[in-house]
Amino acid sequence: MKFDKHMLRKYFIMGSQNCHRDPREILKEAASAGITAFQYREKGKNSLTGTAKVELAKDLKAICHDFQIPFIINDDVDLAKQLDADGIHIGQDDQPVEVVRKQFPNKIIGLSISTNNELNQSPLDLVDYIGVGPIFDTNTKEDAKTAVGLEWIQSLKKQHPSLPLVAIGGINTTNAQEIIQAGADGVSFISAITETDHILQAVQRL
């Protein structure tokens, strides 16, 4: 699947550990409501491992392809290869971008960036987009870093106007629009979908 920055507009991230009900049903509802990309992030307390993780990933990939949205895997290079995922998203503490790009020459690659130092040290020419944040404080990630705020999005867009950027961290239906107005190509979110009983309305407002 060829990358297009419009894929970032409503970027849903989820693993089974984020869900109070079947993640397959949540993804189906979110996909039919209009999310533009999905990242499978099976990490942290109560997350699946082994065969259970792989089987869920296969099901979620099939749902994504039914709705023609990219299926991206967080961090797990082996799983991304095994499932022939559309892309992989890596953090600063994961495998180096150069190594990942060699393994996935034609896949979508996203990179998390939280500081100017990380930005300056990253091979931006090898990634399709950057995930910037946390924009606001968040409780979803146990290892979340200090919030960077909207101003940093504006600064990044001035420095790298053609680099696709998706914001992450503390994003919900009440603040998503101001992030887009600040210059982000999209917003990514977890609990805004997994914690609501009204997925259609939430996706429309994100």
From Swiss-Prot:
Residues recorded as binding Mg(2+), renumbered to this chain, are D75, D94
**Domain of life from the UniProt record:** Bacteria
Does the record carry Membrane as a key word? no
Query: What residues bind 4-amino-2-methyl-5-(diphosphooxymethyl)pyrimidine, as annotated?
Result: Q39, Y40, R41, E42, K43, N74, S112, K141
Q: Name one GO molecular function term.
A: thiamine-phosphate diphosphorylase activity
Reactions catalysed according to its record: 2-[(2R,5Z)-2-carboxy-4-methylthiazol-5(2H)-ylidene]ethyl phosphate + 4-amino-2-methyl-5-(diphosphooxymethyl)pyrimidine + 2 H(+) = thiamine phosphate + CO2 + diphosphate; 2-(2-carboxy-4-methylthiazol-5-yl)ethyl phosphate + 4-amino-2-methyl-5-(diphosphooxymethyl)pyrimidine + 2 H(+) = thiamine phosphate + CO2 + diphosphate; 4-methyl-5-(2-phosphooxyethyl)-thiazole + 4-amino-2-methyl-5-(diphosphooxymethyl)pyrimidine + H(+) = thiamine phosphate + diphosphate
Would you tell me the protein name for this molecule? Thiamine-phosphate synthase
A GO biological process this protein is involved in? thiamine diphosphate biosynthetic process
- Where does the record place a coiled coil? none
Q: How is the cofactor bound?
A: Binds 1 Mg(2+) ion per subunit.
Q: What family does this belong to?
A: Belongs to the thiamine-phosphate synthase family.
**Co-factor(s):** Mg(2+)
